[in-house]
Amino acid sequence: MYEGIQSPLSVKSEAYAGRIVKMVQHLHENGNKHFASVYNQVLRSGTSISANIGESLFAQSPADFITKLHIALKEASETRRWLNVLKE
């Protein structure tokens, strides 16, 4: 894909990353300080989804494209697990 052209997945993942950033900021300000390392992990894995989807748009090969999206999927799974930890 070319710069300036975004897929629906790219747009949604960027919006999700923005919500993750806002949520983690709120948790750092108002949440239990003992969970700060978990908040930071949510931030890392949650924003990595969008970063990898963005990288996939400029993949050097079909295999590279698939690899980037697979990494994004794994980061999404990790983020969900950390969010479940915080929910409990």
Residue ranges and their predicted role:
Residues 1-88:
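Amphipathic alpha-helical assembly/interaction segments
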